[in-house]
């Protein structure tokens, strides 16, 4: 190692079209950080051309580094091992190996996604954030729990950056397209109705992209299409982040990734955080997009916490998921850090609950105990979109809470519906949330939960927001919160329903996940369609970006 107490690491980033080199110390001081983007002459990234760009650019950037700090002062070499494009990753890994061997220094391959989270924490005051990671290749909602960054929500098809870039290419805009979409969106005035697809804490952009292209083809102004595309997509992202916040009760939210540079997305998330009374963080622009400093910083964190890697272990991992990384550096047993990790989002005292969509107030309806669920206005959404969503979901919830009883699924009785004010007054169920029972170690009702879901699916009803927060248990189990519900007998929709539940369990009940999931599936398997649905879960999960 070097002569001082500081460890100096050089990081090489090259997962797609951006080539980055960064140098950082173990005290978090960035000595060098530069990224050069490959801009294709013809729209779209060609993997081989991107790899050639890396090969040329790494040499230039390393020469620049040597003018700032002698390379023999480097103590550690870190490189992005994945996820990413195969050709790009191979060039990056080869450069890292050659550099480590020539300098006779240790080498560590790191996860690109986790690097974004850790550089964000370094460059902000965030300590235990719920993280929205948005880029050209990734869209994930992440939370640290059980020594991993768990993927609580993610895209079911394409990433948000990819969506924006594809639309820009369709409109003959230059790469990277998201920048031009943002510029045009600022001039848009007319909001165009587009598909809004949220499934629990997961999200889908493919339908939105196709519809936006059709709007462009129908001679709508490009400014209005970009405005509507951006407002719809970013509202969806903000909503799934808020849903994850409601489920995990994290005290802070952080935005990272290349799309984090978008001012409108930052504005939306900040508004939501103010409404939920949690802190919001986003690193400065140079640390939002892909960069070498983030790779170097994660290399340091892993190295000083015991990670070692032989040169033979540096094979690239194109499908390197965030939740594959063992995270042993977050808590180091100081009382202050433990207090931070135990800190939770606070719910206003006059409410008995505050979800992602609604405030829950306890009261009385005639002689019965009741709760009133009010879908409150969301300041981050345009007025037209907000009114449409709140009205539609209030109607849906009232309808499905009533219909679900026809299939022997318990749900609260509805006393009153106020569509104008987006309120539903319903029976107060004495009991505990399934989430709280599991935290107490009581898994007795998990099999019954599986049976309820099976009955619901036999009735061709999809909940679309199955989490352990949406079941109440006393002597029986009750299902609640049908605002995203729909009719469908598609095997895929039933599989996605269960996947949403699976992720919610893993996000906060990771230590009991196997036992909980086995019991739920045991109950669900009583129903005739179950075998096909359970098989299809594996097919849907394979679509996950970098699974």
Curated annotation (Swiss-Prot):
GO terms for biological process: tRNA threonylcarbamoyladenosine modification. The active site is at 465 (proton acceptor). Fe cation binds at residues 112, 116, 133, 290. Its cofactor is Fe(2+). Its EC number is 2.3.1.234, 2.7.11.1. L-threonylcarbamoyladenylate binds at residues 133-137, 165, 178, 182, 262. It is an enzyme of class 2 (transferase). In the N-terminal section; belongs to the KAE1 / TsaD family. Component of the KEOPS complex that consists of Kae1, Bud32, Cgi121 and Pcc1; the whole complex dimerizes. It comes from Methanococcus vannielii (strain ATCC 35089 / DSM 1224 / JCM 13029 / OCM 148 / SB). Binds 1 Fe(2+) ion per subunit. NCBIfam families: arch_bud32, arch_KAE1, gcp_kae1, PRK09605.1. The keyword Ligase does not apply. Residues 346-547 form the Protein kinase domain. It is found in: Cytoplasm. The lineage of its organism: Archaea, Methanobacteriati, Methanobacteriota, Methanomada group, Methanococci. This is Probable bifunctional tRNA threonylcarbamoyladenosine biosynthesis protein. InterPro entries: ATPase_NBD, Bud32, Gcp-like_dom, KAE1/TsaD, Kae1_archaea_euk, Kinase-like_dom_sf, Peptidase_M22_CS, Prot_kinase_dom. HAMAP family: Kae1, Kae1_Bud32_arch. One of its GO terms (cellular component) is EKC/KEOPS complex. Residues 1-329 are annotated as: Kae1. It catalyses: L-seryl-[protein] + ATP = O-phospho-L-seryl-[protein] + ADP + H(+); L-threonyl-[protein] + ATP = O-phospho-L-threonyl-[protein] + ADP + H(+); L-threonylcarbamoyladenylate + adenosine(37) in tRNA = N(6)-L-threonylcarbamoyladenosine(37) in tRNA + AMP + H(+). Its main location: cytoplasm. PANTHER family: TRNA N6-ADENOSINE THREONYLCARBAMOYLTRANSFERASE. Required for the formation of a threonylcarbamoyl group on adenosine at position 37 (t(6)A37) in tRNAs that read codons beginning with adenine. Is a component of the KEOPS complex that is probably involved in the transfer of the threonylcarbamoyl moiety of threonylcarbamoyl-AMP (TC-AMP) to the N6 group of A37. The Kae1 domain likely plays a direct catalytic role in this reaction. The Bud32 domain probably displays kinase activity that regulates Kae1 function. It comes from the Archaea.
């Amino acid at each position: 190692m070097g002569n001082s107490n500081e460890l100096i690491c050089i990081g090489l980033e090259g997962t797609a079209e951006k080539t980055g080199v960064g140098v950082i110390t173990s005290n978090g001081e960035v000595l060098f950080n530069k990224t050069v983007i490959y801009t294709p002459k013809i729209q779209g990234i060609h993997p081989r051309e991107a790899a050639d760009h890396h090969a040329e650019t790494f040499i230039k950037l390393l020469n620049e580094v040597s003018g700032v700090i002698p390379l023999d002062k480097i103590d550690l070499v870190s490189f992005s091992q994945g996820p990413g494009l195969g050709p790009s990753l191979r060039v990056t890994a080869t450069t890292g190996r050659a550099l480590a061997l020539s300098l006779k220094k240790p080498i560590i391959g790191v996860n690109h996604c986790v690097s974004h989270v850790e550089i964000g924490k370094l460059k902000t005051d965030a300590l235990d954030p719920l993280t929205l990671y948005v880029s050209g290749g990734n869209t994930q909602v992440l939370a640290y729990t059980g020594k991993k960054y768990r993927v609580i929500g993610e895209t079911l098809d394409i990433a948000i950056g990819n969506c924006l870039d594809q639309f820009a290419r369709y409109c003959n805009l230059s790469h990277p397209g998201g920048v031009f979409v943002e510029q045009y969106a600022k001039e848009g005035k007319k909001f165009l109705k587009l598909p809004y697809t949220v499934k629990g804490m997961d999200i889908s952009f493919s339908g939105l992209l196709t519809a936006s292209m059709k709007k462009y083809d129908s001679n709508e102004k490009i400014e209005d299409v970009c405005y509507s595309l951006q407002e719809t997509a970013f509202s969806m992202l903000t909503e799934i982040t808020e849903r994850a916040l409601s489920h995990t009760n994290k005290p802070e939210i952080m935005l990272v990734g290349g799309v984090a540079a978008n001012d409108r997305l930052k504005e939306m998330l900040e508004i939501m955080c103010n409404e939920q009374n949690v802190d919001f963080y986003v690193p400065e622009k140079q640390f939002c997009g892909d960069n070498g400093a983030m790779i170097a910083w994660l290399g340091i964190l892993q190295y000083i916490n015991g990670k070692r890697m032989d040169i033979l272990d540096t094979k690239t991992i194109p499908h390197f998921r965030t939740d594959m990384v063992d995270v042993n550096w977050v808590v180091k047993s100081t009382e202050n850090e433990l207090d931070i990790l135990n800190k939770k989002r606070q719910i206003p005292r006059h409410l008995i609950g505050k979800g992602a969509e609604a405030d829950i107030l306890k009261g009385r309806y005639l002689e019965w105990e009741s709760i009133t669920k009010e879908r409150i206005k969301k300041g981050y959404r345009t007025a037209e979109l907000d009114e449409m969503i709140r009205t539609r979901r209030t109607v849906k919830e009232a309808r499905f809470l009533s219909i679900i009883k026809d299939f022997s699924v318990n749900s609260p009785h509805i006393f009153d519906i106020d569509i104008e004010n987006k309120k539903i007054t319903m029976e107060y169920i004495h009991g505990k949330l399934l989430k709280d029972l599991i935290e107490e170690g009581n898994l007795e009702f998990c099999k019954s939960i599986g049976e309820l879901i099976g009955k619901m699916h036999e009735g061709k009803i999809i909940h679309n927001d199955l989490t352990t927060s949406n079941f109440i248990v006393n002597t029986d189990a009750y299902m609640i919160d049908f605002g995203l519900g729909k009719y469908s007998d598609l095997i895929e929709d039933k599989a996605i329903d269960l996947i949403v539940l699976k992720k919610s369990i893993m996000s906060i009940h990771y230590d009991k996940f196997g036992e909980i999931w086995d019991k739920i599936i045991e109950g669900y398997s009583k129903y005739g369609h179950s075998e096909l649905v359970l098989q299809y879960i594996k097919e849907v999960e394979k679509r996950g970006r970098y699974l």
